[in-house]
Amino acid sequence: MVDKILLNIDNAKPSFEESALPYVPYNLKLRAGECIIVETGSMELSTALADLCSGIVKLDEGSVKFEGMEWSSLNEPRLSALRGRIGRIFQQGGWVDMYPVAINILMPMLHHSSSAIDKLTKQALTLCRIFGLPGLPMDTPRHMMPVDLHRAACVRALLGNPDLILLEHPFEGFSEDLLFPLFEMLNTAQNKGAGVICFTQQFSLWNYYRERVTHWMRLQEKGLTLENQ
């Protein structure tokens, strides 16, 4: 399992006009079951690199492959199907405010996969309880408490057992009672072969999870660098 490369960013230089990332080549390999922690002081750079991993950013050079397929070579419906294998916590929310949070949680998987709604709903309810929600929230995002909306974001990111999990600053500004349910679920996901990339402003926030961390990296103006921890 550990030899399977899930995500391969190979000398990828993002388009200067379309990305907030510094205009330098990026290299990263994530194998099944691995976890990479990326430290950066810029939330904007975190989102931009997560977009690069998801095949959203146009490249001037290099390639980004997910599960062996190069994003730039894919068209619909294969493109949407592959993005359905990615779970993500967005640091700016990524909620559609006209819909209840429950619909926001289920909608990405319903759009990107052929999973039955009753199966997804059952899994979503289980995840809600794990993260401290009594059930699927029926309020709209603007009417949710920030901490409960963050719990819902964790549920959405893990729904459908994604192969790649991208977490943009999941702990900053939230209480520690969210740490351990997420650590537990990430540990389970890695054991099943998922790859995890987590963005943080401080490596120290991940000390409790360091035994499952494969690489520590830093994202700066000069690009991605490997760090020793």
Residue ranges of predicted features:
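Helix-to-loop junction immediately C-terminal to a conserved catalytic motif
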Residues: S54
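Conserved ABC transporter NBD signature motif
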Residues: G62-S72
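ABC ATPase NBD coupling module
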Residues: W71-G87
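Q-loop/switch helix immediately C-terminal to the Walker
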Residues: Q92, M98-H111, Q123
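Conserved ABC ATPase "signature" region
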Residues: K119-L136
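Conserved ABC ATPase signature
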Residues: T140-D148
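Hydrophobic anchor residue at the start of the ABC signature
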Residues: C154-V155
